[in-house]
Amino acid sequence: MLFRSLSTDLKDAVLTALKGKIDGGGAAGSVKIYTGTKPAGPAVAITSQVLLGTLVLSYPCGAVADGALTFSPITQDSSADATGTATWARIFDSAGVAKIDVDASVVGGPGFMQMNTTSVIINGPILINSCVITA
């Protein structure tokens, strides 16, 4: 996010609003992981990016503190839909409405979403180790 000069309490307010939108459907949201270039935003349609798999968020999805939304454990996808390199993910509410796109990387990499591996094999598991969105 681009809110680097905001106070921590204001960052927390922005992220609490995001968390509220993800949890707003009254049930668990989801994360869809894709290959390719991340679109300009969650309202932009998927084009050539390949859907690798879908994972289910916890409900509520996480907690906000100190300018970060830290997601609770995310249920793995036990059978990937396709083979490819995970580069980004789109997070949805329980009604399937896209809320935010985030970069993916291996643990220790620069992505908000950290995976044990970004190399996904069809029918293999997809695991998100952590997802922390900072403002």
Language model feature labels by segment:
Residues 3-87, 93-135:
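Small cysteine-rich, disulfide-bonded extracellular modules of the LU/uPAR three-finger superfamily
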